[in-house]
């Protein structure tokens, strides 16, 4: 039992809580500095030569679960440990302190009052009414007053003692919500071309919400670099058969039916071309990482009734240019969407259009309401904690006509001392 008490005292100590907060902050910093949720091959490739912090290669990074910090075993362990520390501290310190503050303390001897931080004794006149005028004065100024014969106890700002337990409770809720969101939340990133839709299924396989991309635009600066991506969405709630139309862009997400939709990325979905007088043909585009980070393309097969041999088509923007390469890798021509036809051999190739696709990130986090509630409770508790709790005791000796006044305050003792003088003045008045 003795060792258990020591362990409990250690777990609920302020030093342990501070160390845990520092470790959690460092873990969060790692999660911010390192890309999260990517494929293992990406970490092995990117951190094999240029190591993270100069010592951590891709293999060690994966072993330490730094590719998913916030759902890693060690990060969740730190959050759980901090929660237990807060619970034990609340149960062992905050709750008894609150119960003690709620209970009235009855000082019966003048020497008990004289030992308080602020105290004073003075003689009153025989025709004075004793502590009754003081009781009325205190009640009129927002004090709670309790009188027993020639003794008076008063207190003000008791709600300030509720603040610390509320802060602890809010932090515990916040941690529970964050952990629940990590364990039960879902994340999905999809590329949608205009007029394409995505059905979001419930756990039992029923389609609850459908997301349709009605339009996608890329805002570019004069040099052609993308500045902003804008997706116009149609969201349909299948339960009530109702649709809403909203736009999302980078840093301007949308929350709908518990799902948050972010504008994440962009891509090129397809290209429509026409060879000579053939029908317009739409080809899907694939990303070609070997040629660069933002390069898409496709190998055009040999078309019937044409002397064209297979061509490699590449582009890096929906605006073009579109480059054609022969089987040998030699440049064969350059064109733009809705531009003049390109003559390759004896064939004319017209680029009708290039269809961009919007990268939409969907996040479902069931812990968000709990996190918001915990944050709100912590904020309210912090405001309450600012309020100082004042306590006052008065004992009147009938025979000697001596009145003893003493008080305590958990903060701003100098301010309470000034108020104390006003209370004494009220006794004379």
From Swiss-Prot:
Function in brief: Required during biogenesis of c-type cytochromes (cytochrome c6 and cytochrome f) at the step of heme attachment.
Disulfide bonds: none
Subunit structure: May interact with CcsA.
Superkingdom: Bacteria
Subcellular location: Cellular thylakoid membrane
Lineage: Bacteria, Bacillati, Cyanobacteriota, Cyanophyceae, Synechococcales
Membrane topology category: Multi-pass membrane protein
Stated name of the protein: Cytochrome c biogenesis protein CcsB
This protein's UniProt keywords: Cytochrome c-type biogenesis, Membrane, Thylakoid, Transmembrane, Transmembrane helix
Similarity annotation: Belongs to the Ccs1/CcsB family.
HAMAP family per UniProt: CytC_Ccs1
Single Gene Ontology BP annotation: cytochrome complex assembly
Entry's Gene Ontology cellular component terms: plasma membrane-derived thylakoid membrane
Membrane-traversing stretches: 14-34, 72-92, 162-182
